[in-house]
Structures are given as C-alpha cells and as structure tokens.
Amino acid sequence: MSGSPAKWKRGLLIAACIILGVPLVLFLGLMATITIMYGPTYAYRVLVYNEATIQDYQRVFPSRAVSNQPPPFIFTRAEQPLTIGQLCFTYPAGNTQTIDFEPYLAQSDSTAFIVIKDDTVLYEKYLNGYSQDSVQRSFSMAKSITSTLVGLAVQDGYIHSLDDKMVGYLPELKGRGLDEMTIRDLLVMNSGIAFNLLPKDAFILSQPFYDEALMYYLPNTRSHILKLHAGREPVGAYFLYDDYYPLLEALIIERTSHKTISAYTEEKLWTQLGMEYPASWSLDSEQDGFEQAASGFNARAIDFAKFGRLFLKDGIWEGRQILPIGWGKEATSPDPNDKRPWMNDPNWKDAGGYYKYHWWGIVNEDGTYDYTATGSPGGQIIYISPSHNAIVVHNGASGDPMVWAMIARSIVHGLK
C-alpha cells in the first residue's frame, strides 16, 4: 500500500458518500417526480407505507363511522365446536394441496376464522392478538358491499336501471370513448376503461405509477376517476379486474342519493342486519372525504358473516326484504351467456369460476354454485355456499384469498 492514512481516510469517505449518496439522489428524484405528478400526500404515502397492510385503517387513512343499531342478531353457538383436521383442496391453477388445518391456520398470519351452518357457529377462532371485537380490514371485499349499495340505489330510485349509461350520471366522462359503458358493465368489470395493471414482477420503484397504487393512496380519488378515458380494449370484450369500477359506482350513488357512502351503508345495511359492532369506511383524505369503495371497509369478522347471511337468505333478513327481490341470485349466480376471455386471473375461470357484481363464484360438480367476496392482502373472504346453507369468514395479514376460498369450500362441502 502507498499513500498517507489521511488520503486513505479521505478516499474511503468519498467512496462512502458515493455509495450512500446515489440511492439517496435516486430516492429524492423519485419523490420529486411523484410529487409533481400526483402531489405530496400521495408521494409520502406510497413511498413511506408502500405495501398495504391490515393496519392501514389506523396508520394511513382517516375514516367515517358507520353505526349499528340494537338489538344485535346473535348466531346460535354449537355445543361442540367443529373439529377441522386434514383438508385436501385444489387451487384454481390446478395443483392439489393437503394441509393439517389447525397448524396451517396458526402459521398463516390469520386473525379470524369462522364457520357457520344453519345459523349456527360451528367454529370461531381469533389469532395473533385479535379477538371478536377486533377491527378487520376488508380490502377488496369492500367491492361486494359497494355493488350491494348499487342494488339498493336501484330499489330506492336513485339509479333508474343497471343498463343506464354511466355518462348519464357522470357527464364529465362524455366524449372519452366511454359513452356506451353501462352501470352493469361496471358491476361485471367489462373492459373499456384504461387501467395500468401492476405486474407481479414490477420493479419496486415503478409501482407508484400503476393504477392500483394510485387508487389506494391518492387523497383526491374523485378528481382522478373523472379524468378516465377508454383503454385499448372495447367495452365488454374482456373481463378486466380493476379498482376503478366500484369507485365509479360509489360516485354515482353519492351524486344521486346526496348521501355519503358511509351514511348509505349505515342506513341500508348496518342498522338493518343486527350488527354487533359499528364499522367504518376509510376515506381518501379528510379534505376530499371520499370512501375507499374498492378496498376500505373496516368491521368485525362476525358482522362480515352477517353480511354474507343476507345473501344466503336472498336479501331477506328476519322476514324483512332488505335487498331488491331477486338481487341476491342475480348478483351471485353464473351467467351462461358470459363468454368473455379474462385479461387477469384466468385460472379462476378455467377452474369453473366466474365473476359477477363483484363476487367470485365457482360452479360445483352437481351444478350448484358457491361465491365469495375476496380481499387481498391477507386472504380476506366471505365464502357463501347456498346448497350447504353455510358461511365462512377468514381475515388475516397475509395469504391468497383464492386459497382460503378453496379451503372454505373443502370445509363446507365436508359438513353434514
């Protein structure tokens, strides 16, 4: 070696500055770009929080309360809890998996698992510090709630027909290639709207520019969705799952009813179904106050089960018709005329699955069908099996909702 110790120290310091400085410059440049394009709140949220978690209703977003109303409806409890042992299920991709349920549940970051048949709770367990009164985040299960509010808005006369053109309610979208898109197109997620789908292998620094991140973290969702335009695919040519559809539905309900989505949920659902606890909708921001209708409903697992029960009873609750007559079946049953190719999640379709009104359905071997409200991350599900008169709810911090749907299916189909 040659050179004085002082020169070596100076050289090491320069090298360290370069090594540490380059990532910092890149990060600051990324933050500046995102801030210019979408504002400082979005830049902060997407870069600091990045991945969505089940704590986002507390750590990221403000919320608006959804009150319940006594008396609560209480499910009967089985005298002897259901024992769930080894399960074998086939994932929609085609691979079969065998698990020992209890160890699998314990190791899966689950927070709640409930099995109900004939209005009787056969199994109810809370894990990882959660209890029955712990708040669970819906993620995309919220879409099924939003679509239900659409049906109620039709019943109340706020929406004339599902076949109405979307632009009749949102005239800002006229002349953007979306004039023929109907409210029904939104409910079945027909292609038509440009949507930048996040690839599974997307470079982490590119993720803030994809629509999934934008729809989750933007503080001004209304103004963003009113700038949408047509995509490359014609309306109805494909099934294209994305978050714009329920947000557009929510905006239509908000405009026609002159009520917030939270107030309408409270009036039409949460005070009508004997919910044991209040709930809330997460908002994009305090200033804009628009509900996260695609991903942000917060409630207890047992009350999610009651929402499932409403559909199991075809919209009737304790003798009262809550949903429009026939809505439960219309929203969840397979459509034999739906021949669309799927742009995403094709394995579900290949396994006999379908998508309708923000429910994921699957046709059984005997011709009956089950359906699920799903949310990710965390494997959130409300699984409903009409032929078995059963409901399964799972909440968690990680996991694939389609895997949990197949686990629920295996359990339910094994019940006597």
Regions found by a protein language model. Name each.
Residues 102-103, 131-135, 153-239:
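Active-site-proximal loop and beta-strand segments within enzyme catalytic domains
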Residues 2-130, 159, 188, 192, ...:
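N-terminal leader/targeting segments and the immediately adjacent pre-domain N-terminus
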Residues 189, 245-252, 293-317, 380-396:
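Active-site-proximal alpha-helical segments within enzyme catalytic domains
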Residues 9, 27-45, 371-416:
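Structured C-terminal helix/loop/strand segments within mature extracytoplasmic catalytic/sensor domains
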Residues 156-198, 255-294, 299, 326:
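Active-site helix/loop module of the DD-peptidase/beta-lactamase fold
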Residues 119, 137-162, 186, 249-253, ...:
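Active-site SXXK
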Residues 275-282, 332-391:
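Active-site Gly/Thr loop motif
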Residues 132-133, 200, 207-287, 292-295:
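Catalytic-site signature segments of enzymes, centered on catalytic residues
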